[in-house]
Amino acid sequence: AVTFRSVVQTIAARNGLYADFSPKPLPDKPGNGMHINLSAAYTLLSGRAGEDVLPRLIAGVLYRAAEMTPVLNPSEASYRRFGSCKAPRYISWSAQNRSQLIRVPAAVGAYRRAELRSPDPDCNPYLAYTMLIRAGLESIRLGLPLPDPVDCNLYTAPAELTAGLARLPGSLADAKAAARAGDFLADCLPEPVRAFYLS
């Protein structure tokens, strides 16, 4: 994704154009997301091969979603994208709907995966993967339960349904406050990196 973005921007510049991969370049149009697909399985050497760990991985990402948001969505423009044009607003999951933070497509077997829909091109993919792996491993270790799916379109859902759902932070300041209130970033990112994202 990083190489692709660089190549497109270079080719555009050579032709007198500008390629914008920011989260929300046009206020009335869909923004740019950087969906991350996650898969998980025990190896044969673990003695637990065949056990389905994807639900635990999803549970961990949901549990730590708010704390990860300032790194997955590090610019003010990131938050203009949330809640419109199929970008998530709530911390929820479903196999059936693209308005969720995490969608589990209908693939099976080796192709089964969870699609995290909140990250955008402003994020550092290496830090994003670090946090997602850490959240998944934490959840597997602690046995976090997977919440029930929210199998409806959250853009048109009634207020009584959405009132019970946790929301993604609504601004960069809110995201930083959520991260400071928790301990997750302190556990998985070095202090200088943390300070950069939370200052």
Over which residues does each language-model region extend?
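Catalytic-core signal marking the mid-to-C-terminal active-site face
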Residues: 7-13, 17-20, 41-199
